[in-house]
Amino acid sequence: TAATSDIVIVAVPWEGHAELLASLRTELAGKIVVDCVNPLGFDKQGAYALKPEEGSAAQQAAALLPDSRVTAAFHHLSAVLLLDQAVDEVDIDVLVLGEERAATDAVQALANRVPGMRGVFAGRLRNAHQVESLVANLISVNRRYKAHAGLRVTDI
């Protein structure tokens, strides 16, 4: 549970993001919070990015959880691959954003525990909107190519 964990991952639909975080403010105080939420809309043309008033879901989390160490990560992972028992390795880089080095280092280390996965520091929370928004493009790629595409950062 959130109260007993050092690192808490938030992976909920955008529509319930703010309400959930506000209700857990006390339980999440002092914890590293990893926001994985992608503010997306969907219509007949497909997925598209929404722009939260705070700038991103992660920035909204930081505003709602002033006593937590908010990071943003794990946005581009395929739930299908993560749940597939036959998959031994997830070939993906996890972009990790945050304000505090120790918190982003901890989240990178968490990503590195999954075979094939690599945590990569990708900047501060003010850049989380771009990372969250890219999921709309990945959804289009995955639909077109019947894939579970992710990202790799090269030359690091």
Predicted region positions:
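Active-site phosphate/pyrophosphate- and oxyanion-stabilizing loops and adjacent acidic/basic residues
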Residues: 22, 59, 109
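Active-site-lining helix/loop region of Rossmann-like oxidoreductase modules
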Residues: 92-156
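Rossmann-like NAD(P)-binding element
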Residues: 1-32, 36-45
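Short beta->alpha connector loops
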Residues: 13-16, 76-78, 100-102
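Short beta-strand and adjoining strand-loop segment in the mid-core
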Residues: 46-54, 59, 84-102
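Conserved catalytic-site region of short-chain dehydrogenase/reductase
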Residues: 42, 77-81
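Rossmann-fold dehydrogenase core element
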Residues: 53-76
